[in-house]
Amino acid sequence: KADAISKYDGQLTFSYNADSGAKPLYDAVVNQLKNNLGIDAATNPIPTFQEFRDAVTNRQMKGAFRTGWQPDYPSAENYLWQLYSTAAADGNGSNDGDYKSPAFDDLCKQAAAASSTDDANKLYQQAEEILLNDLPAIPLYYSNASGVASLNVKSGYAFDWQNRSEE
């Protein structure tokens, strides 16, 4: 189906910073694409996070590359606007793929001006539908924090909305 939409010739590369410990993950992605879909894929490890970010910031990446985001506050806006708005593209923010959609931007602006959180979230969900159709990024994995609990433990750790521990 993908070839019917847009034929792709050549090798698909996945760049990541080699000092992250993510090699097994990207090797697995490449092997899945090769073995299951017959896509010529390869990893492109970049030695350090600094070199990796410099290449992303300077728009020197070829092919797919890893990104990540940790929200500053618990709101859809902190993900959507920061990562996909036109205002955050072209080196002006964290829209590293330089995605641009006036319809997406308009919905996010309406959501930011909404009079209630529920109204804002409905608009953000509509904006997410645009992202789902345009697919400017493909989530490959999500990092989680793990914890255990027991009635026999009197104090311990709790995790906040950013998966950071609180004592």
Question: Which role fits each region the language model picked out?
Answer:
Residues P24-N31, N35, Q50, D54, ...:
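Solvent-exposed, polar/charged alpha-helical surfaces in well-ordered, non-transmembrane soluble domains
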Residues A28, Q126, N133, F159-E167:
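Small-molecule-sensing regulatory modules
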